[in-house]
């Protein structure tokens, strides 16, 4: 049986010892008390100083409350998972403790509204998942984007997945950012995002050229799917992916989840990426 959450949190997750945590709590409470005492004893404090002290006191209390809420959410979330899933599916989790044999490698956006385990009801052990901004798959390059490359290699070469699914979605902020990049414009102050979404630049260019009369929002909608097609094409630049596709032991598909309408579109890669199915 898994250890109790309280022990797990204290010994596995905490960065400080219990003694230091207690000291930190005492220091925090002492700071609050000191500020309140200062307000009550120093009647001659200027209005500005008094207001700043009150604001600081309120901010400290709010921060403590926020931290407590976050910890409680994590605790109750794990407790519910353990009670409703882990303990009720002992056979599955005993098997997963020894190995994993997922059938899917899934690329999905980091957007909090599009978790593939929820929208496609994947159970533990079913899908090896990679999430990033705008669900991008960069082309094969051993010197760049090695995190994605390592995930693809592990899933295809070692886990022997039979399916790769790249899922785009409605209202994607990454795609909106991509479509907002102007030709020959100076780089933005973004440290990572702009260069990352430019992986889908060919999708942006195609939509801009073929649908120049559409509104920006409509262009973004089309680019959400076209960027998936670019990622599907990029997957074929990985030698180990291409080899399995040629042997017909690996299928590559694109998907698009519209959480506004509650629909999911699915299409297969036949080197043309033509739409095949739609669910509603």
UniProtKB/Swiss-Prot annotation:
Residues 47-76 form a coiled coil. It catalyses: hydrogencarbonate + H(+) = CO2 + H2O. It is an enzyme of class 4 (lyase). GO terms for biological process: carbon utilization; negative regulation of stomatal complex development; regulation of stomatal movement; response to carbon dioxide. The modification S-nitrosocysteine is found at residue 223. The modification Phosphothreonine is found at residue 57. It is found in: Cell membrane. Pfam families: Pro_CA (PF00484). InterPro entries: Beta_CA_cladeB (IPR045066), Carbonic_anhydrase (IPR001765), Carbonic_anhydrase_CS (IPR015892), Carbonic_anhydrase_sf (IPR036874). The keyword Kinase does not apply. Keywords: Acetylation, Cell membrane, Coiled coil, Lyase, Membrane, Phosphoprotein, S-nitrosylation, Zinc. CDD domains: beta_CA_cladeB. Reversible hydration of carbon dioxide. Together with BCA1, involved in the CO(2) signaling pathway which controls gas-exchange between plants and the atmosphere by modulating stomatal development and movements. Promotes water use efficiency. Belongs to the beta-class carbonic anhydrase family. This is Beta carbonic anhydrase 4. It comes from Arabidopsis thaliana. The gene is BCA4.
